[in-house]
Structure formats: structure tokens, C-alpha cells
């Protein structure tokens, strides 16, 4: 009887060892699906994208027609691109990435500028918003859309509760009126036009000017009062002074570089620069800076 028990134990031991091995393998496999404890990961982080004017006033989706969010990792390599809505709560969850850089552009898809076609892994510094050139001889570009821009950095220490991600206007506005221009030139025939100089033709994803210099040829026409008027149009922001060339039949007639008090023509993001050039008698130039969309109505003196 003792001998039978001994043989029974010998037979059962291999089975027990096999079961222990299988159990250990299952536990190991289960752990393999879990994140490595040594790899940091950003917990789900929520934010709301909001838009503001130059004075901090809140703007709605009647102003922001489209909104694209670009998510970059700690090395500024693209992780993801998402189309979102204004004031939508956006949750970001990218395991293994404890630092993120977010860049958002509003109205970039409205067609008056070229947005970058980024792929996963592309570096932030290779991304640009570019003007569409309409003429290469100067060169001349078309007016961009009402662009908005914002950027924010997220770290592993950031509060996971919803955070505000602000966007602000990333273009400047210009409106030009010329009085008694035909009398000054001495002709009612032929084409008149403005050339506005200069900005760069690109904005990078830091929101800074980049690229090469470009000019603008805004739409303009004579109104019923004989004033040559260019309604408000957009240009890329610039810290340099701008200049306005006035042409007739492709011949430069004059260049406006400052007002009558010597103040240079300067634009500001989210503001409208109004310029009045009066050619009656001594040439007089007035300028004013107004809120976005509020073009100055010049009174006849």
C-alpha cells in the first residue's frame, strides 16, 4: 500500500508542475497588456477651445467656421490631428506621452490660404500656413481668411479638469480711401489699383511670420462720390511698417508711407487700420485704428 502511494505521488508531481507553469504564464501574459510602470503617461486631459477678439470679448461659431487641433509630442512630432467645435470639451489621452504641445487654427479651411498636409511624425517646425499667390512678378498674394490661432503646452503635472484653450485673431485688417485721385492723376480713364507692401507669405506653428516677402492687391473701385475705396481686407501680421502704392495704368503715381503727422502705417493683430488719402491741394493722409469690422466713415471736411 505504501508503495502504491509513492508511485501515485510520482505520477501527480509532473501534472502539478505543469499547471503551475501554465498559471505563471497566464499571469505574465496578463501583465504584458498593462503599461510599463516605468513609462509615464498623460491621464485623460480635457479642454475647451474658445475664441476672443483683441479686447478679450468672447466670439462664437458665427465667426469661427472651422477649427483644427494639432497634437504634438514632447519632441514636437505630430501625434494626431482633430477637427473640433468651438467650446466643445475635448479629451486628450495619449498613453506614454507626458508632455504635449497643442496648436489650433480657426478658419484655416475656408480656402483663402494653404494649410499644411501633416502626417504622423512630422515636426512642428515644418508646418506653415501659406498665402496663395495670385501674381509672381512682385509677388502678390490674395487676402487670407479671418484666421485664429492658439497654442498651449500640457505636462503630466497638469490638472486633468477642463481647461480653457484660447484662440485669438491672427490677421490684421486694412481699409483704404483716396479722394480726388482722378483729379490728381488727370485722367478718368484706365485702371487704378493699390499695392500694399509688405508682409511675409507664411505663418509658422508658433504663430510667427515666416517665409519670403509678399504684397497685396486689394479689390478697389470708385464709389458714387468719386472716392477710390478698398473695403477692409486681411493681411498677415507684421511688425514692420507697411506702404501703399497707388497705380494708374500700371504706372506708380505715389507711395503712402505715413500720415500727415509723420506717423508710419502700422497694423495690429485683430485691429483695422483705416487710411484716408486726400489729393485735393496739398496731399493729406489721415489714419485711424478701429475695432475689427468697424470701418471708419471719413467725413468730408
Regions flagged by a language model, labelled:
Residues 63-118, 186-266, 298-301:
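Tryptophan-paired
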Residues 136-226:
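A sequence/structural signal for flexible, mid-protein segments enriched
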Residues 97, 157-160, 224-227, 267-272, ...:
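Solvent-exposed, conformationally flexible loop/turn segments
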Residues 48-63, 177-186:
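Structural motif
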Residues 77-169:
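Short, low-hydrophobicity acidic/polar segments
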Residues 255, 263-293:
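Phox homology (PX) phosphoinositide-binding domain
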Residues 2, 19-55, 270, 286, ...:
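Bacterial Sec-dependent N-terminal signal peptides
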Residues 2-13:
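Bacterial N-terminal signal peptides that target proteins for export
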